[in-house]
Regions:
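Proteins enriched for Cys/Gly/acidic motifs involved in redox and nucleic-acid/cofactor modification
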Residues: 98-129
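Lipid deacylating catalytic domains
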Residues: 1-52, 56-61, 118-189, 193-316
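N-terminal accessory alpha/beta regions
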Residues: 43-110
């Protein structure tokens, strides 16, 4: 029987993993129903990889709890202090991502921060990053400086801090191994930062379960700073054990920013194509995987038939 592995995204430290899994499965069930599928995966059918507390503790320099399987408002006056505490490498990463998101939002060209990350150091780099974050707050719908700070902190730590990457990767590797009792295939659904983790693990794995579907809604893999960090470690590839890769995106989701087209995420000649459908995410900010609405229905990527439909096909 094909199993389901779910990998969450950014900024979920301190949350109850069982409640998060229930939300994901609730939204996915709604999406499957909308797609005409009779399937309703339950906790018994899925492994939810929760690394939120592990990532938070590793980033803060403490002893991490284990990876388990089962947006804040920013005071503009606090931005210089928050940004100034970041190391130069993370500052450059933050500035690169902020500028690319601002370009994607088509902000006014006369208010572009006057410097670029390359070669900028010290106070000038802090000032440029603070200016870019202020512009994000002003011009980018659905994204705040606080959200972007958290996203870049988490993604940068995963991409550039070996101890963070090893710990989080190990949790997903264990989930992939534990999801099957033999050679059963595994469907992987990975949202936001979780898609970076899933890609990194699957692209680097040798023997392991077949993955009939890798689903990466709202992925930041197409953001240049993220893609280039991955490509600096190993060439970009279509993971060998993945049969189908679907990467849905709402064009208003500026934390995902780009469709995973060959121009944005180039793969070797002859590689299978990544399917990149455009969808409409009704969740606030257009980025959430699962979002409960007041009327008891679901929003978020997983609640959409175009997103959940491929999961139903792969699980049958």
């Amino acid at each position: 029987m094909t199993r389901l592995v779910l990998v969450h995204g950014r900024d979920l430290d301190g949350r109850d993993p069982e409640a998060l899994e229930a939300q994901w499965l609730g939204a996915l069930g709604a999406g499957l129903a909308a797609a005409g599928s009779p399937l309703r995966p339950t906790d018994d059918d899925a492994a939810f990889v929760y690394y939120g507390d592990t990532l938070e503790r590793l980033v803060d320099g403490g002893t991490p709890p284990p990876v388990t399987v089962h947006a804040l408002a920013a005071d503009p006056a606090a931005l210089p202090r928050l940004v100034g505490a970041l190391p130069d490498g993370e500052l450059r990463f933050l500035l690169d991502v902020a500028r690319e998101i601002l370009a994607g939002a088509r902000h006014r060209p006369d208010v572009v921060p006057p410097v670029v990350a390359e070669g900028v150091v010290g106070d000038a780099l802090v000032e440029a990053a603070v200016a870019a974050l202020a512009l994000v707050d002003r011009y980018v719908p659905g994204v705040s400086a606080a959200v972007l700070l958290t996203l870049t902190r988490d993604v940068y730590a995963y991409l550039h801090v070996d101890a963070v990457r090893r710990e989080i990767d190990a949790g997903l590797v264990d989930a992939l191994a534990g999801a099957t009792s033999g050679d059963e295939p595994v469907v992987v659904v990975a949202h936001s930062l979780g898609s970076v983790v899933a890609y990194s693990v699957l692209a680097g794995r040798g023997p392991g379960p077949e993955v009939p579907l890798l689903l990466t809604p709202g992925t930041p893999l197409g953001i240049r700073a993220v893609r280039d960090a991955l490509a600096s470690r190993a060439p970009l590839v279509f993971p060998a054990r993945v049969a189908r890769w679907v990467s849905p995106r709402d064009p208003r989701d500026l934390l995902a920013l780009h469709d995973l087209t060959p121009a944005v995420f180039p793969l070797p000649a002859g590689s299978p194509a990544i399917e990149a459908p455009r969808v409409t995410n009704r969740a606030p900010g257009f980025h959430a995987a699962a979002y409960p609405l007041d009327d008891g229905s679901w929003a978020g990527y997983l609640a959409l038939p175009e997103v959940a439909g491929p999961v139903g096909e792969a699980l049958t």
